[in-house]
Regions:
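SAM-dependent transferase fold signal centered on methyltransferase-like domains
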Residues: 1-149
Length: 149
């Protein structure tokens, strides 16, 4: 995964092209990309393993497993795709919003616009989407209630 720190756009490419990253593809900056990886970009979790972990945790003390069960539930709800992950705090900072939009509200807005959007089960406060940075900006400008703009 590569990210343009100037405009925020994210992109990915296969390991076979690792040395051949181009500059940012957006119209406004053509900046060099900050590259992370190589990274695994598929789902991290097996639902069968998570189901078994949840079953095993039922025999343990809730004081030990409360946070673990919450994590298992988050991982089960996270399909692991799309690969690009965003923070509502980053959106608020990048787009000069008064405050970060609630995660569930923003996911609902993205879905209403036809995008895939899910909570990131690995990183709390982040969401996964196939929307580009320009599309995220448009949703922020056109769909967020006035209290956030």
């Amino acid at each position: 995964i590569a990210r343009c720190y100037f405009c925020g756009e994210q992109t990915s490419q296969t390991l076979f092209k690792l040395q051949a990253w181009e500059n940012c593809c957006c119209d406004s900056c053509s900046s060099r990309l900050a590259i992370n990886g190589p990274l695994w970009l598929g789902p991290l979790q097996s639902n069968n393993v998570l189901i078994e972990m949840k079953r095993l945790s039922e025999n343990l003390s809730s004081s030990v497993t409360s946070q673990s069960r919450k994590l298992i539930n988050r991982l089960q709800a996270d399909p692991g795709l799309p690969v690009f992950s965003w923070s509502t705090h980053e959106l608020a900072s990048r787009f000069s919003l008064k405050s970060p939009p609630p995660l569930d509200l923003f996911i609902k807005l993205l879905r209403s616009e036809g995008f895939q959007a899910f909570r990131n089960g690995v990183v709390p406060g982040h969401f996964r989407t196939n929307a580009s940075i320009r599309e995220l900006l448009r949703v922020c400008e056109q769909k967020l209630p006035e209290g956030f703009k």
